């Protein structure tokens, strides 16, 4: 299916010089959305998905319902994720339009399904532009170890999956040293 036709573009949003790729039209067509979620699930190498808010949630949560994923680990903006002492991990990221912080919980990682001797994760996000968000989160996750049923498991992001990759931006080059990259739709910025 040619998903590219469903995308909408907004120049100079959210700031001048950034061209926004809008994926919301996928939510307005049930058959298209279902097909897209199935295609995303088919390329995810892990049963555990890590997804930054909020659009990443839109495409990964249905995978839980359908049994195509075991767990979705949310990565949230500041003030959006309740936590216990020592549970919250802060990640510094470089976005296309500035620096930011995002957060995830170690307890969410401990709810993942181990495969062999690791906790494998697929990183999913809607857009790959510069790769700053993806790189920051994956570098942080790959350094973690969680205990499940008394056994320690290292966390390893096995792959990146993106709905849309902007091919003329350096995103892929900036992250592919950490894990293989799959993108369902390829566009150019201009």
Where are these regions (language model features)?
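Active-site-facing substrate-recognition patch
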Residues: 1-45, 102-110
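PRPP-dependent phosphoribosyltransferase catalytic core
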Residues: 5-6, 139-190
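Short glycine-rich phosphate-binding loop at a beta-alpha junction
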Residues: 46-54
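Structural motif
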Residues: 47-48, 120-122, 159
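Short, well-ordered alpha-helical microsegments
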Residues: 56-60, 168-169
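Short Gly/Thr/Asp-enriched flexible loops that form oxyanion-binding sites at enzyme active sites
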Residues: 58-67, 137-139
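Short, glycine/charge-rich flexible loops or terminal/linker lids adjacent to PRPP-binding catalytic cores
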Residues: 70-122
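Acidic, divalent-metal-coordinating active-site segment for phosphoryl/phosphodiester hydrolysis
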Residues: 125-138
């Amino acid at each position: 299916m040619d998903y590219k036709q469903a995308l909408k573009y907004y120049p100079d949003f959210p700031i001048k010089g950034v061209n926004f790729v809008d994926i919301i039209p996928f939510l307005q067509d049930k058959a298209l959305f279902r097909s897209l979620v199935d295609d995303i699930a088919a390329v995810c190498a892990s049963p555990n998905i890590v997804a930054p808010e909020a659009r990443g949630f839109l495409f990964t949560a249905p995978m839980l319902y359908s049994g195509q994923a075991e767990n979705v680990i949310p990565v949230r903006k500041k003030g959006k994720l309740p936590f216990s002492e020592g549970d919250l991990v802060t990640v510094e990221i470089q976005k296309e339009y500035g620096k930011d912080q995002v957060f995830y919980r170690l307890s969410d990682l401990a709810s993942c399904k181990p495969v062999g001797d690791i906790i494998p994760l697929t990183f999913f996000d809607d857009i790959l532009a510069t790769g700053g968000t993806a790189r920051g989160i994956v570098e942080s996750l790959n350094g973690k170890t969680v205990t499940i049923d008394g056994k320690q498991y290292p966390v390893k992001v096995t792959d990146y999956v993106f709905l849309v990759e902007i091919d003329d931006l350096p995103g892929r080059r900036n992250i592919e040293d950490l894990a293989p990259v799959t993108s369902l739709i390829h566009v150019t910025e201009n």
